[in-house]
Amino acid sequence: PECAYAPWLDPALERAGVRAVCVELTNALGLGSERHLQPMRSADGPLLWLIDRAVIALAWGQGGYPSRPPYRDYHAYTTHRHRVRRIDGGRYDHVAATRQARADAAEFVSAVRARVRDGGVCVFAIDTELLGHWWYEGVQWLDAVLDEADRQGLALTTLDAAREHHEAVPAPAGLGSTSWGEGGDLRTWSGPKVAAFAWRARAAELALAATPNPSDRALRELLALQSSDWAFLADWELAGDYPEQRAQLHAEALARELRDPGAHESKVRGLAPWLAGWS
């Protein structure tokens, strides 16, 4: 799944030239632990930057900034699909929402300054679709955060720059698999509710691995089958039987391609163009 990590990936990441990854270790270290502010060095691979869930929750969590009353309600439509309601059900006022975004930006920067008062790096990593999509005023909020950071004296940096000034400590032994998803683990993609998706993808992976020189088409069908969206949609019951249908179609297409390479029209040739000639 996206944004997932397991220690056994370290050597592969190292070979791929990945210097650093952002990981979710809240379950291992505890919410708000100061250990989240220091990079960790894995034994066999890249630098681990720990996303700071306590700060991320200010914008991403239940009751975070986007839920405040003046903001535009993403889910409330008129007959003609216009969004004209605030979160609290009142009539939307863009001026008031902009004012709220600036106030929330000032509050956010103040919270981060307090978080790193004694040093360290706060990694605020989110799905950027939140900004401007789910949270209409999110882009204005981010713009105001940049202004507030300058005004309040909060240094903004990139991870490449930060690694030059922050010494990494060894990662704790025994880290398991983690993700940015529900529960900080892999339950959304391999829990009992979606076990069939996980087993089907694994069986397909083994079948392809046992095939000498599999075609590019076969590799692409496997990638499409392994898409984390199918299990996610099924686990959250967001799209009826569509994810099951899509996963099954890719599994069947892969099986046909392994049996009779090149005999069937490909509908995934645009996926992962870098695979051309890989095998």
Language model feature labels by segment:
Residues P1-L13:
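A conserved hydrophobic secondary-structure block that centers on an alpha-helix together
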Residues C3-Y5, N27, R53-V55:
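Short acidic/polar capping segments at secondary-structure boundaries
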Residues Y5-W8, L31-L37:
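Short alpha-helical segments and helix-capping/turn motifs at coil-helix boundaries
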Residues V18-L31, A155-D160:
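His/Asp/Glu-enriched short active-site or ligand-binding loop at hydrolase and phosphoryl-transfer sites
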